[in-house]
Amino acid sequence: MGAQLELIPHQEVVAPTVKPVSLQDRIDLAVDGIQGLIRSGRRLLIATSFGKDSSVMLALVIMAIRSLAERGHRVPTVHVMHADTGLHENPVVQAYAHRQIDAVRDFADAQNLPLKVWVASPGISNQYLVNMIGGRTVATVGGMDRKCQQSLKAAPLGKLRRAIAAELRQGMGLSYSPQKVVTLIATRRDESVARGAAMAARGESSMEPVNLEADSGGDYWVYSPLAEWGTMDVFSFIADVTNGRRRTYSDFAELTEVYRDAGGDCMVNLHLRGEGERRAACGQR
């Protein structure tokens, strides 16, 4: 008798359920990551333009250090950096940023938080518009914004980082190391395909800091706590603060107004039309 075939009952393959990541999950992960850096002895520099992404990042940093302090952890000074681009900046945006700087300082004083705000400005001889008028550079058009960005933002912030490093070196003595200094930046992968690709190429993530100057033997460590955040996560966080569900250095009402005034619409509608993510290197962020 030939071998009999055993019939195997059909089993339906059920795909595993993937739980969506909630806003609170993203907040908890970001706060845990920031606290982990502090507990490991890293000194934090926070780069902020007071645009939507960097404002949310700064609020997360404040949440992290407040929580640590409440649990009895010693939190070293966190250095907040802002680039005032001077003549080029929209006066409304510039005035808004100055008020945000005052708000951060007032909140830190009231809450006894170890925050120190530094403001970088391009020297008058390096002002982009002064150089253009004086014939030392030419106006950038289209995508030719690297010289503008370098003059007004990157170079002054680089000088500021060196000044902060010198202060840390003096205060920490022999325990100081360039590897201990980490700059938090508010880059997100979903800002654009190009931004996501650039972040991947540099190794930026919300998991651990990356040294952007490793190839040249330098030490410029950056950490991106918002790397995996979507634009709607950012908007939802801002809405929570504006509606009083979360408290930080600002109620973000003026931040919302700046975006609304810029486009005549609410931030969410700007995003849906694709206008909320358009940024020039020397423009509003």
What are these regions (language model features)?
Residues M1-I46, K52-R285:
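Nucleotide-activated chemistry modules centered on ATP-dependent adenylation/adenylyltransferase
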